[in-house]
């Protein structure tokens, strides 16, 4: 009995490394350090690549003239390339009416279905031209509305690397890989993804990240493996819904 419980916990405790804001202009020095570390530990992260980066904050970083070859090389290693918005420029405010009630500015929220499809199609076209297959998406600042999900589905993307929950789950023909915390945390039970913005890191942050990966290496899994963990049904939906409300209340009490 105890052995069965331990096995169940072990099989259902894992983390997907999700890296945000991967673009031509970024902190390339730290990216190279992360790449070497991933190779050493045989970790296959998911990289959120911005297909047409126009974010003024990101454009301040050094530019790689060989960016798309770098992306293809990462992809050949088995790293998952995910579409992270289109141009990473915010044009609307959500007033916490976005799907996950994060609030703040958004690249997609509030736009018409046709406008959102145009952005998504343009992004996907860029990846096709660069010979990179896209199976997943996550929006800048976690902000979506129902049009975003409909546009993604109509463009053939059903995997969203975002949301609340203890487990990856399927809802209305979409798969959601939960992303709960702003720093690397390994829960004692459950499967989620990280949120890593290495452009804002200092050397100390990288060293802490390295320690975290070495400590939890065996529990870090690839995108393909996490897709096999997607669950559905009322029980899973209820757990994730309850967790969502607990997190929202906790965040509200901090302000």
Question: Predicted segment positions?
Answer:
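Divalent metal-coordination and catalytic microenvironments
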Residues: 137, 194
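Catalytic alpha-helical scaffold of carbohydrate-active enzymes acting on polysaccharides/glycoconjugates
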Residues: 1-136, 143-189, 201-255
């Amino acid at each position: 009995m105890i052995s069965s419980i331990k096995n169940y916990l072990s099989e259902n405790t894992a983390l997907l490394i999700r890296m945000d804001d991967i673009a031509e202009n970024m902190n390339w020095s730290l990216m190279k350090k992360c790449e070497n570390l991933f190779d050493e530990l045989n970790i296959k992260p998911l990289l959120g690549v911005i297909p047409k980066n126009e974010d003024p904050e990101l454009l301040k970083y050094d530019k790689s003239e060989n960016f798309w070859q770098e992306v293809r090389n990462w992809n050949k290693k088995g790293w998952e390339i995910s579409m992270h918005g289109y141009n990473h420029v915010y044009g609307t405010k959500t007033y916490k009416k976005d799907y996950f009630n994060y609030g703040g500015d958004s690249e997609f929220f509030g736009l018409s279905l046709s406008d959102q499809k145009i952005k998504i199609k343009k992004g996907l076209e860029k990846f096709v031209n660069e010979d990179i297959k896209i199976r997943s998406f996550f929006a800048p600042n976690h902000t979506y509305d129902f049009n975003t999900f409909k546009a993604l589905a109509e463009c053939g993307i059903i995997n969203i690397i975002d949301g609340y929950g203890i487990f990856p789950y399927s809802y209305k023909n979409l798969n959601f890989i939960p992303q709960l915390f702003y720093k690397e945390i390994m829960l004692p039970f459950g499967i989620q993804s990280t949120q890593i913005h290495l452009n804002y890191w200092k050397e100390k942050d990288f060293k802490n990240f390295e320690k975290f990966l070495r400590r939890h290496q065996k529990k870090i899994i690839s995108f393909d493996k996490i897709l096999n963990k997607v669950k559905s049904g009322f029980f899973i939906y209820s757990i994730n819904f309850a967790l969502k409300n607990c997190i929202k209340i906790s965040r509200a009490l901090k302000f």
